Amino acid sequence: SKIGLLGHSQGGVVASMTAGILASRGESPDALVLIAPGSVIQDACMGGRFFGAEFNPADPPEYVKCFGIMKLGREYILTTQELDIYGTAKAYTGPVRLIHGSKDTIVPMYCSEKFIETYTQDAELITVEGENHMITRKLKTVVSHAVSFFASQLI
């Protein structure tokens, strides 16, 4: 049986790194879909500014509050600073589809573009015009891009 991984935002970072770790163990998934993969989290944690929260990146507090509601802990911030996101991800050499909204103001397009550079093999980036980060405008289009890719790779 074949396996595909999909992740959105921070889940895209998790899916990309999981695919890389599995590939390095000889257990590579058969397809990977990343929707607005949020590798910007590393820049934010290293820069001391995470979506409304400001902190000393070398000595973050016990937790910071982002978006006014979400708490991120000190260990999350410190661990994220040290992740080798792209280095881990590049061990995966299977087919990849990246999907990113043109109006995403949370995860910049450069994050998906960097993944395209990382995956030098069978990788493509689909830009969904007018879509935001939360996929509230063209959900059916985004889902269709993911499902059609998995259907072509896994069935």
Regions found by a protein language model. Give the residues of each.
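The alpha/beta-hydrolase serine catalytic core
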Residues: 2-4, 20, 26-127, 131-152
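Gly/Ala-rich beta-loop-alpha elbow adjacent to hydrolase catalytic centers
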Residues: 7-11, 15
